[in-house]
Amino acid sequence: MKNIEIDEELYQYIATNTQFIGESASAILRRLLNLGVEAKLETVTVNEPSDVVEVNILPESEEKAVKIETAEVKEPKSKAVVKVTAESHETVFNFINKEELAMQRGAVGRFLLILAALYRAHPDQFGVVTDISGRDRLYFANSENKLAESGSSTKPRQIPESPFWVITNSNTTRKKMMLTKASISLGYSDSDVEKIRELL
């Protein structure tokens, strides 16, 4: 285990993204960076200033490959920003915290947590859910107003940590159907779709 210094703002960000009591900072950062729980720790030491810092991580398998972009370092004390893009295929199950799900009082809270996990697993593809609609109204949109315009008493709620909104004034069966359609749209197998439905 290595120690690093971080500023107060980063510390607060990590602390607010804790999903359960006892979760380590490493686990939180792995989740936020989409590195998964099995990623190897890599240490880079720079003793002298250089123009470019390059980090290479050799993946154990193609599925766990990680792309690293380099950043220029202009002064020895300046901070280099390294953007890490995970290429592994994350699933909603990597982001579901069953303890937090169980603590929700009602179906709406569980529904929003499951949708938030789907968004975190597939942030780039999640927009496909805005095509899911009922006979007379939209179920998902990228603004509260769009959902309000599509019908009365929709009770739009923002999906946590995402730019998307969903209607919540529907029964549990309808919510399960919405989760089913969203999961199918995001490419889940029939068995995984059923597991996602049952989380509600």
UniProtKB/Swiss-Prot annotation:
Pfam families linked to this entry: SeqA, SeqA_N
One Gene Ontology term from the biological process aspect of the record: negative regulation of DNA-templated DNA replication initiation
Superkingdom field: Bacteria
Region (Interaction with DNA): 107-108
Gene3D superfamilies named in the record: Met repressor-like, Replication modulator SeqA, C-terminal DNA-binding domain
SUPFAM superfamilies xrefs: Replication modulator SeqA, C-terminal DNA-binding domain (SSF82808), Ribbon-helix-helix (SSF47598)
Compartments (UniProt record): Cytoplasm
UniProt keyword list: Cytoplasm, DNA replication inhibitor, DNA-binding
InterPro entries: Arc_rbn_hlx_hlx, Ribbon_hlx_hlx, SeqA, SeqA_DNA-bd_C, SeqA_DNA-bd_C_sf, SeqA_N
Keyword DNA-binding: yes
GO molecular function: DNA binding
A GO CC annotation given for this chain: cytoplasm
Assembly and binders: Homodimer. Polymerizes to form helical filaments.
Family: Belongs to the SeqA family.
Function noted in UniProt: Negative regulator of replication initiation, which contributes to regulation of DNA replication and ensures that replication initiation occurs exactly once per chromosome per cell cycle. Binds to pairs of hemimethylated GATC sequences in the oriC region, thus preventing assembly of replication proteins and re-initiation at newly replicated origins. Repression is relieved when the region becomes fully methylated.
Protein name (record): Negative modulator of initiation of replication
Organism: Colwellia psychrerythraea (strain 34H / ATCC BAA-681) (Vibrio psychroerythus)
